[in-house]
């Protein structure tokens, strides 16, 4: 998977996914290797942003500063789902660019991302504390997307 159509405007929130509950998943945390359940890291926050990314994905690298900006400007719970990546490459990516994520879960074979309805990387879901999808962003986040997310989470 790779986001195709980088020259197209960011597409978001297909009607079939809005207000749909994101499927629960379990995976290992990138740094600690601890097995975590998605519901347990979402339920205690009013909003959670789940960002599917890879170290080899150029658009992921390009949007990363926006995730760092979101972390600084909000108390948003940001979860990274590392897609089809090598652990050492993912850790190097985070060490070089900073870590906007409260947790980074691994998806080494891509099955979790596919089960969530992702078409490629990057993709981002804004969820409420019941894991319902408020927004889905296909492709790299834009400054406008970040403004929209900030407006939603501060409302």
Regions flagged by a language model, labelled:
Residues 46-48, 52-56, 120:
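Short pre-active-site segment immediately N-terminal to redox-active cysteine/selenocysteine motifs
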Residues 95-100, 107-154:
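Thiol/disulfide oxidoreductase modules built on the thioredoxin-like
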Residues 49-50, 78, 124:
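Hydrophobic beta-strand anchors of alpha/beta hydrolase catalytic cores
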Residues 1-30, 155:
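N-terminal targeting signals for export/organelle localization
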Residues 25-48:
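A short beta-strand-turn-helix
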Residues 58, 85-89, 111, 141-144:
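Short alpha-helical
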């Amino acid at each position: 998977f790779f986001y195709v159509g980088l020259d197209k405007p960011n597409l978001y929130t297909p009607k079939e996914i809005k207000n749909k509950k994101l499927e629960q998943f379990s995976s290992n945390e990138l740094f600690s290797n601890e097995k975590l359940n998605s519901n347990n890291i979402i339920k205690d926050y009013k909003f959670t942003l789940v960002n599917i990314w890879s170290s080899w994905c150029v658009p992921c690298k390009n949007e990363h500063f926006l995730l760092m900006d979101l972390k600084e400007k909000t108390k948003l719970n940001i979860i990274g789902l590392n897609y089809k990546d090598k652990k050492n490459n993912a850790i190097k990516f985070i060490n070089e660019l900073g870590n906007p994520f409260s947790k980074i879960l691994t998806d080494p074979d891509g099955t979790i991302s596919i089960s969530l309805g992702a078409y490629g990387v990057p993709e981002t879901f804004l969820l409420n504390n019941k894991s319902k999808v408020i927004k889905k962003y296909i492709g790299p986040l834009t400054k406008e997307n970040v403004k929209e997310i900030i407006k939603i989470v501060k409302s």
